[in-house]
A protein has these predicted regions:
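Active-site acidic-Proline motif in GNAT/NAT acetyltransferases
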Residues: 107-116, 146
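Conserved active-site alpha-helix within GNAT-family acetyltransferase domains
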Residues: 120, 145-163
Length: 186
């Protein structure tokens, strides 16, 4: 099983669980309580919608413990003097890596929290998580051609444009080096 939580300077990034996804989908008033964070007014953000949540829940249900950490992740802004812990984004992997170590990520940040570097930090956390597994060698991401903010987030995280993709999207990719402790067997 891979680690199910990672931290960045401003974010706690937590792997989705069946309990969290079930609450988010079917008991939204319990969701922030289970998550331990306030919700933004415009939740869910971007392309992170009920269909994505249902897919992630189905994959976690079918895959059991081995699927944990390979689908959705919640980005919680850490508490400070001005705000409690707050859910600011969602992202994650579209599944475990393939046989050659390629995995795909996606991400979305709530509108109220955009423009503060949190998308960049979320993607950095996902890259960190991918490296920590020791299983991922390359990450892919896709962004709409007109979503310049997403392009910048990916570029700031060392993704490179890799050409057009389906549905008017651009493909980005980057190499991933396994974390040192994985290489050392620590």
């Amino acid at each position: 099983m891979i680690p199910l939580i990672t931290h960045t300077l401003h974010l706690t990034i937590l792997a989705a669980s069946r309990a969290l996804l079930t609450a988010e989908l079917h008991k939204p008033h319990y969701f922030p309580i289970l998550l331990g964070a306030a919700l933004p007014t415009d939740w869910p953000p971007g392309d992170y919608d009920e269909a994505v949540m249902e897919y992630q829940l189905d994959q976690l249900t079918a895959g059991g413990r081995s699927a944990a950490g390979w689908y959705g992740w919640y980005a919680l802004r850490k508490a400070d003097d001005t705000a409690p812990p707050t859910l600011v984004g969602a992202g994650g992997f579209l599944g475990p890596p393939d046989a050659v170590g390629t995995a795909e990520i996606d991400f979305a940040v709530a509108a109220d929290w955009r423009g503060q570097g949190l998308g960049t930090e979320l993607v950095a956390g996902l890259v960190q998580q991918a490296a920590a597994t020791g299983m991922v060698r390359q990450l892919l991401a896709h962004a709409a051609t007109d979503n310049l903010a997403a392009h910048q987030v990916l570029l700031h995280n060392d993704f490179l444009p890799a050409g057009p993709a389906a549905e008017g999207r651009l493909r980005f990719d980057r190499a991933v080096e396994p974390a040192a402790d994985i290489l050392l067997g620590a």
